[in-house]
């Protein structure tokens, strides 16, 4: 059943779909997070994964930056390891460390023993989506998931990693095990995204946080087929889909290929790549999202104002050069030390330009 809302005036959905928005849309990755005192107050009482599986908490945390900053989109408060936890994989999110896996995946037998994700296991997430779509009014809700490669890296390494040694060793040296793992994680990612779509999200974003550690050759051989299946399957949902990674300048063309042809497609760009270069690298018909350096928000208003104006100008130039649209965002997530007042002022400035 299609529970999606009609939001014809949304500048975010317009830009993501290749239409002309009435203003430059803006939202921020990690806009619901530690930069907000109201978030810190809630999180002082609840562990991260506990919060991610509490529908009312997810709703409240997701709404906080929408109320405060008047951004043009909400993104569901969650974590990329939530579907792994929901499926029954032992893990925890350790403060100041990140996701830590109880029993890392190292063999084909480990892969074959992995549980699948069933929709009842993410019922709290779906309920949070329903609560949010009832409360958000004309603001669209973005659902999201981690991409198979990034999930695989956490599972194989056992936690965050600088060099992803075990992940790449499996990928390059045990390709049958690797592709079996990626197939299982692609199925899991699709199931998690589908549960969000069925509950009513208005758009999707897939985060491949660690894809930038790969060469283009390895990305095409070992990752692209699986990411492409995620987007090809989800294209039937009829919602805009964004593909984002960090340090992925050389991969932007391939990442745009992963997005299903004919769907509303957006490629996220980090601050290391100009929007002009990104527009030249992605396939025709893709919009761009980005790409302010998150650290700029720590540098004081005169610096922020200049940088925000530049990104808006660069976005307009990219659209003139052929990009389907531009959505203002950061090139990564909001840093915890960011003054929320600066974010509010940046949103107001983007809307005024």
Swiss-Prot record:
One of its GO terms (molecular function) is uroporphyrinogen decarboxylase activity. It holds the Pfam family URO-D. Its EC number is 4.1.1.37. Substrate binds at residues 30-34, 79, 154, 209, 332. Gene3D superfamilies: 3.20.20.210. It is found in: Cytoplasm. Keywords: Cytoplasm, Decarboxylase, Lyase, Porphyrin biosynthesis. This is Uroporphyrinogen decarboxylase. It comes from Mycolicibacterium smegmatis (strain ATCC 700084 / mc(2)155) (Mycobacterium smegmatis). The gene is hemE.
